[in-house]
Amino acid sequence: MQVGDLVRSPSEPYLGIGIIIETRSRNHKIKWLNPKWGCSWAGPGRRILELVA
């Protein structure tokens, strides 16, 4: 996964789709397209992500 990829969190479907805006090591900062959720971090031990085709 890299900056600009569209992702979603299968364990938290209410978050919807997000875009990776920053990557540090194996952690990714996600800007959620739903303005209600803002930004959050994902990575090992945090939030599971999968790419949106």
Task: Please name every model-derived segment.
Residues 2-53:
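Basic/aromatic-rich interaction segments and small domains that mediate binding to polyanionic partners
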